[in-house]
């Protein structure tokens, strides 16, 4: 009698886990971007999922904040997933990938080292694509109230009586 462990093939556990994973890939659909840690996900309608993932990485490289999750960068990039913006964004991502390939990196998203990605961005920082993404990030990222605590910003003060009434008149720090 042969012991089950000595048989070639896969175990029941492997079969079940692979079946579930394969089934999930059909349910999720094509226009889907998910975090590597599984903490968030978003669907794209006009951009390719890989292009959106590249834009998110680009956003993180332009304004790097280790204390912020990719989810907030994804929210900031969501506006570029429109019929009007998608062609320019796809062309910009193609230019990023071409620059990375020219350096022997594969694609921008596959470039492992941040300093290499930043060098790629520096090479195109005068482009309309780069300026559009960078400019949109200023409001798209920093206008999210959920990220304010990470920077110690308490938000606007007018609706709370102004800054003076909230302890900002203490000049002991001078």
Model regions and ranges:
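N-terminal secretory signal peptides
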Residues: 1-10
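Residues marking the start of alpha-helices
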Residues: 6, 43, 105-108
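C-terminal segment of N-terminal export signals and the immediately downstream linker at the start
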Residues: 9-14, 27-63
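Sec-dependent signal peptide hydrophobic core
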Residues: 19-27
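Short amphipathic alpha-helical segments enriched in leucine
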Residues: 20, 59-63, 97
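Mature-region segments of soluble proteins
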Residues: 53-57, 71-174
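Post-signal-peptide N-terminal segment of Sec-exported extracytoplasmic proteins
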Residues: 65-71
């Amino acid at each position: 009698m042969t012991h089950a462990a000595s048989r070639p093939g896969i175990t029941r556990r492997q079969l079940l886990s692979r079946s579930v994973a394969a089934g999930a890939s059909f349910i999720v659909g094509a226009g889907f971007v998910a975090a590597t840690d599984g903490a968030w996900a978003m669907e794209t309608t006009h951009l390719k999922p890989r292009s959106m993932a590249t834009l998110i990485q680009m956003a993180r490289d332009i304004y790097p904040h280790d204390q912020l999750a990719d989810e907030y960068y994804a929210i900031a990039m969501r506006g570029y997933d429109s019929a009007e913006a998608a062609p320019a964004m796809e062309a910009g991502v193609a230019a990023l990938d071409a620059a990375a390939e020219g350096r022997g990196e594969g694609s921008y998203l596959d470039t492992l080292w941040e300093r290499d990605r930043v060098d790629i961005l520096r090479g195109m920082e005068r482009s309309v694509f780069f300026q559009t993404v960078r400019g949109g990030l200023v409001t798209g990222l920093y206008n999210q109230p959920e990220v304010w605590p990470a920077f110690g910003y308490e938000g606007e003060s007018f609706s709370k009586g102004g800054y003076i009434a909230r302890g900002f008149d203490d000049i002991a720090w001078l």
